[in-house]
């Protein structure tokens, strides 16, 4: 599988932390398409806008996926609307919020995904203290689960030959770092979607969120993450 430096991935930059002095040093352009797989920053801030404006000039296409952190401080609807407004300013930036984009015979399927939280009240009690439910306005556990169900349906309904799925949350428990294996809150980071990944139509799955980078690449498929705030983040890394 080789498309000659078609895709470059970055996620979990967290521009909202205000500790990045030079946005030009975050990514070294090395591909046609930049995939921003969530938790890039707060879209209500100038640094988020400046970041997209800068890299829009360096890539042919940019795909944006929202992570959970983009929504902190606002509602889901308010945040999505703001990102749409920003992306509308650029011909080459596309917000794949339950949307698809076809390029060079590849169908890119984008969604935040969220994750499968089991109907277990013990787990519910643990999860209710997480920031997603404190900092995203009008956001509940039930809403979280509904979003996941809807996003999975969106992925399945749109699969076709040569599909690459782009999500923020991880598609498999193999994406979880070894030291966190078995933790009950892993259900907020990854879901067991290996069956979808192994579908003959799927050639790749890009994700973020776990802050644990994975590069699983075979002749027919890849599963890949490149989170910014990690020791092995690759500024110029490409997948295919």
Stretch-by-stretch model annotation:
Residues 1-64, 70-78:
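N-terminal active-site segment of His-dependent metallophosphoesterases
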Residues 2-4, 102, 186, 191-203, ...:
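Binuclear metal-dependent phosphoesterase catalytic core
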Residues 4-14, 105-114, 164-168, 222-228:
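Active-site-proximal beta-strand elements of phosphoester/diester hydrolases
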Residues 8-11, 34-39, 63-68, 94-98, ...:
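Active-site neighborhood of phospho(di)ester-bond hydrolases with catalytic His/Asp-centered motifs
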Residues 14-20, 41-46, 69-79, 100-102, ...:
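Active-site environment of divalent metal-dependent phosphoester hydrolases
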Residues 48-52, 78-82, 183-191:
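Charged helix-capping and loop-helix junction motifs
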Residues 61-135:
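A basic- and aromatic-enriched beta-loop-alpha substructure that forms the phosphate/nucleotide-
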Residues 109-183:
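Active-site-proximal loop/helix segment associated with metal-binding centers of metalloenzymes
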């Amino acid at each position: 599988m080789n498309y000659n430096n078609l895709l470059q991935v970055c996620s979990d930059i967290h521009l909202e932390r205000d500790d990045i002095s030079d946005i030009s040093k975050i990514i070294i352009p090395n591909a046609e398409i930049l995939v921003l797989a969530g938790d890039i920053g707060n879209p209500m801030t100038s640094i988020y806008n400046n970041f997209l404006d800068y890299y829009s000039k360096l890539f042919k296409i940019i795909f944006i996926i929202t992570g959970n952190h983009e929504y902190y401080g606002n509602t889901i609807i308010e945040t999505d609307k703001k990102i749409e407004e920003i992306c509308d300013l650029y011909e080459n930036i596309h917000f794949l919020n339950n949307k698809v984009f076809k390029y060079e015979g590849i169908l890119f399927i984008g969604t935040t995904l969220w994750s499968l939280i089991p109907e277990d009240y013990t787990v519910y009690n643990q999860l209710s203290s997480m920031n997603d439910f404190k900092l995203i306005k009008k956001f509940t556990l039930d809403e979280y689960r509904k979003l996941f169900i809807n996003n999975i349906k969106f992925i399945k309904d749109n699969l076709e030959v040569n599909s690459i799925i782009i999500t923020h949350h991880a598609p498999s428990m193999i994406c979880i770092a070894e030291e966190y294996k078995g933790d009950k809150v892993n259900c907020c980071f990854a879901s067991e979607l290996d069956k979808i990944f192994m579908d003959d139509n799927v050639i790749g799955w890009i994700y973020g969120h776990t802050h644990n980078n994975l590069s699983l690449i075979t002749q027919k498929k890849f599963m890949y993450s490149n989170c910014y705030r990690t020791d092995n983040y690759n500024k110029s890394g490409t997948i295919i």
